[in-house]
Amino acid sequence: MGRSRVVIPEVVRVPLSEGDYIDVKRDLNAGEYFDLLTVMAERRKFAKILAYLVGWSFVGQDEHPIPYALDDPEDARRDTIGALDKGTLRELVAAIDKHEAAQDQALAKKKATLPVTDGALVSAAT
């Protein structure tokens, strides 16, 4: 029996500096990944952040939470990200890139531990 080839929707918390965190999708499914590649090819800003980011712990100058929800329109979420300072944007990008690389590495390791078959085709008897 092989591995499951379906992405189970999960959210993981990624720590940032100063006690902050972001919540991101553990992994993108094929449709989400294709959408990400498409918007990245269109050079739309914050494409990868929008694909992964689910929420965060950020507060504004008034110490109130900065709202961010997947239910908000994409343009509103893009504008919210665009209002952050450059250092926070860099930290978001680095954290999501690191998370994505770790997930890719975990998948490669999982694939490497699967039993090797001889490549023979199996057909169902009718």
Mark where each language-model region is.
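Short, surface-exposed, charged amphipathic helix/loop patches that serve as local interaction elements
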Residues: R3, D20-T126
